[in-house]
């Protein structure tokens, strides 16, 4: 029995930013999506995340698989003819294999090239998206206060202290976002200035990649209302 080492599929793609590890999710056959928060809770404080200087880690079933991130076109041409290269040329190319010492800007996308020991080459796009959040948000003119979830980075809790008797099922929401995105209630877009049911079950802010609309960062929003 001849076993051919032809592994080109990642088990995991991730980055670690103390105190959390952020795992990418597979999208289709040739893409992954990595979402990061703007801030994360660490020792009880909201700490700003710097996505522009982070490492990319991966788990691959075979140690013989070569992995390159943002490979130069000239090197990709060499990789396609790897078997025909001299041992010195092969070694030079292997020296460009990605290691966890290299840091990347995880606010932008990356192309990951994989070559199995058997010679199969596959390319993936790693879409990097920051979870969207409200820059400002008010309900009937009252500002919401954001509390971050230390264990669920996509969960954002906004607390509003409203006058007693306020009907939150028929309230006016005004907001700005911290970038591109769409505020949704039960799957329907709600624009700023709308009077609507803010006691609905599913509130979210969705951000899609400009390069691939299927690549998204979705923030699960919770509104907490206090009355006085």
Model region roles, listed by residue range:
Residues 1-228:
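Beta-rich interaction/scaffold domains
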